[in-house]
Swiss-Prot record:
MF GO annotations: oxidoreductase activity; zinc ion binding
Cofactor note: Binds 2 Zn(2+) ions per subunit.
Keyword Ribosomal protein: no
The organism of origin for this protein: Streptomyces paromomycinus
Designated name of the protein: 2-deoxy-scyllo-inosamine dehydrogenase
Catalytic reaction list: 2-deoxy-scyllo-inosamine + NADP(+) = 3-amino-2,3-dideoxy-scyllo-inosose + NADPH + H(+); 2-deoxy-scyllo-inosamine + NAD(+) = 3-amino-2,3-dideoxy-scyllo-inosose + NADH + H(+)
Residues involved in Zn(2+) 1 binding: 37, 59, 143
Function in brief: Catalyzes the oxidation of 2-deoxy-scyllo-inosamine (DOIA) with NAD(+) or NADP(+), forming 3-amino-2,3-dideoxy-scyllo-inosose (amino-DOI).
Keywords: Metal-binding, NAD, NADP, Oxidoreductase, Zinc
UniProt cross-references to Gene3D superfamilies, sorted A to Z: Medium-chain alcohol dehydrogenases, catalytic domain, NAD(P)-binding Rossmann-like Domain
Length: 339
C-alpha cells in the first residue's frame, strides 16, 4: 500500500509498505479521506510535542472497516471515523474519564501510524460508525467538530452570550458554528487571511477584523455593545492570547484551544487579575464524537467552507506547502486516499 511518512522535520516521503495486520482488539480500515490539521503542520516542521519520527501522520479521517476480529466482526463493511487517542485505560486519569491526560498516551498520526495511507489499524473501541447519507468526505470533519464542541462546552458557553474568536482555520470556523449551536452569538472574528474572513462571513459571522495586534481590541472599543463574554483563541499565535485578555469583558472567560510551541506567549497578568478573568484550556474531542456525527448527518454544520483543497497522496508536497502558506484561499487541505 501507499503511505505518506514524516521521516524528519520537513521530510515527507511517499512510501510503499505492506498492509498492516490488525492486532487483537483492532480493526483494519481502508481509508477514504484525511484532512490536514494545524498540528500535522507543526509536526511536519518538527515543532510539536509527543511525536515520533518516522511515522505516518493523519488523524482527521474517514474510511471503511475491512477486517475486525473477535466480537467486532459486525464492523466489517461499516463506514467509520475514530478518535486518535489510544489510552492505557488504567492510570488515574483514564479511570476518571480523562484519556487525553493518560500517563502512557499514544496518538494515531503522532506516535503510531495514522491515516495518510491506504490502510490503517485502529483499536475497535476508538471507532464510531457513520450513518447512511453522511459522505466520507464530510466525515473527515467529525473529529475537529467534536474538538470544537468540547471546547465550547468546557467554556460553558450558553445561550445569549457574545463570543469573539481569534483564528479562522478549520477549528476556528467550526468553533463559530459550535457557538451558534449552543445558542450564543459570534460577534467578531479576528483572522489575517482574507479568504478565511470571507469563509467566516459565509458562515454567518457578522464582523471580522485582521489579525494585527490591537485590531480586535480596537473593534471592541468602537463597538462596546459587542464586548465579548467569551474569547475563544484558536490561532495558536502568542500575541492573540494578550489580545483576548484585553478584549474580553471584565469577569469574562478565555478559551485556549489553538497552540504552538515555537514561541512563548507574553501577557500582562494584571489584566487577568484586575478584570477577574477565567482562563480555560481545551484539547481533544472529549465525548462529543456522537453529537458531531449527528450534527453533520443532519446538515446542521457546513464543512464545505473548510474543505477547500483536495490532493492525492502523490501530491503531498504541494498539499503541505499550500496548507503551510495558507495560499490560494486555503482553509483546510485534505487527501483523497482513493484517488
Amino acid at each position: 500500500m501507499k503511505a505518506l511518512m514524516f521521516k524528519a522535520p520537513l521530510q515527507a516521503v511517499l512510501t510503499e509498505r505492506d498492509v498492516p495486520e490488525p492486532a487483537p482488539g483492532e480493526a483494519l480500515v481502508k481509508l477514504a479521506y484525511n484532512s490536514i490539521c494545524g498540528s500535522d503542520l507543526s509536526f511536519y516542521k518538527g515543532v510539536w510535542h509527543g511525536f515520533t519520527y518516522p511515522v505516518v501522520p493523519g488523524h482527521e479521517w474517514s474510511g471503511t472497516v475491512v477486517e475486525a476480529g473477535g466480537g467486532a466482526a459486525d464492523l466489517v463493511g461499516q463506514n467509520v471515523v475514530g478518535d486518535l487517542t489510544v489510552a492505557c485505560g488504567s492510570c488515574r486519569h483514564c479511570t476518571v474519564g480523562k484519556p487525553t491526560l493518560c500517563a502512557d498516551l499514544q496518538e494515531l498520526g503522532f506516535t503510531r501510524d495514522g491515516a495518510c495511507a491506504e490502510y490503517m489499524t485502529v483499536p475497535t473501541g476508538n471507532l464510531h460508525r457513520l450513518p447512511e447519507g453522511l459522505s466520507l468526505r464530510e466525515a473527515t470533519q467529525v473529529e475537529p467538530l467534536a474538538v470544537a464542541l468540547n471546547a465550547v462546552d468546557r467554556l460553558a458557553v450558553t445561550a445569549g452570550e457574545k463570543v469573539a474568536i481569534t483564528g479562522a482555520g478549520g477549528i476556528g470556523l467550526l468553533l463559530a458554528q459550535a457557538v451558534r449551536l449552543r445558542g450564543a452569538e459570534v460577534t467578531v472574528l479576528a483572522e489575517p487571511v482574507t479568504e478565511r474572513r470571507q469563509a467566516a462571513h459565509a458562515l454567518g459571522v457578522p464582523h471580522t477584523v485582521g489579525g494585527d495586534p490591537g485590531e480586535l481590541v480596537g473593534f471592541v472599543e468602537k463597538h462596546p455593545e459587542l464586548t465579548p463574554d467569551v474569547v475563544l483563541e484558536a490561532s495558536g499565535y502568542p500575541l492573540a492570547v494578550q489580545e483576548a485578555v484585553e478584549a474580553v469583558r471584565s469577569g469574562g472567560r478565555i478559551g485556549l484551544i489553538g497552540y504552538r510551541i515555537e514561541e512563548a506567549a507574553t501577557m500582562a497578568p494584571h489584566h487577568i487579575v484586575v478584570k477577574v478573568l477565567s482562563l480555560q484550556a481545551s484539547m481533544g474531542p472529549g465525548d462529543r464524537f456522537g453529537e458531531a456525527i449527528e450534527l453533520l448527518a443532519a446538515g446542521a454544520v457546513d464543512v464545505d467552507a473548510l474543505l477547500s483543497h483536495e490532493f492525492g497522496l502523490a501530491d503531498h508536497d504541494r498539499a503541505l506547502d499550500v496548507a503551510l502558506r495558507r495560499a490560494d484561499g486555503n482553509t483546510r487541505s485534505y487527501f483523497n486516499l482513493r484517488a
